[in-house]
């Protein structure tokens, strides 16, 4: 009986070093390439497998391979940032809608930076933006939302025009999405 109790306890115990933070496993090393200043920006294309008109997300068409897509506004891989009228300072930004296909049900972690310069990219926040965006297992709802899909709006904030990339990490994937930004 004692051996069975010990084995049961070991089976339920977490491995050494396992984190209580459910987001820790999504904090993979960033694999965002650096570009030389003036190099062509390898913008991620719109995923044509998705009927973006029917899905009706704020932000138009999603770019990248999925299962998580940013809707940057318009129909492609360009984001127009506006001055930060709410908090002021050097950051500019705008609304981006993040669409999650019904085929993926887990958490999502998004981080990014400028690829052709030293500037960072942030999300939401106040005077200073947050360094990452977390998409939980719940969603806002919208007209045309496919059953089982999720999505959240966020503010994406930058300090300069250029070529930017975000790394989108889920439990079963890691994707990079690249887009251009025009900032004031």
Task: For the regions a language model picked out, list residue spans one by one.
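Secretory targeting and sorting signals
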Residues: 1-18
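Contiguous segments within soluble domain cores/interaction surfaces
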Residues: 19-159, 169-170, 174-184
